[in-house]
UniProtKB/Swiss-Prot annotation:
This is Elastase inhibitor 4. It is found in: Secreted. It holds the Pfam family Squash. The presence of a 'disulfide through disulfide knot' structurally defines this protein as a knottin.
Length: 31
């Protein structure tokens, strides 16, 4: 398992389910 950097763009985050939670937090939408 390799650590992945999630995209900062929300539309891209939604496509990356493996990192969705992290992306949401990075984008300021944690919760």
């Amino acid at each position: 398992e390799e650590e992945r950097i999630c995209p900062l763009i929300w539309m891209e985050c939604k496509r990356d389910s493996d990192c969705l939670a992290q992306c949401i937090c990075v984008d300021g939408h944690c919760g």
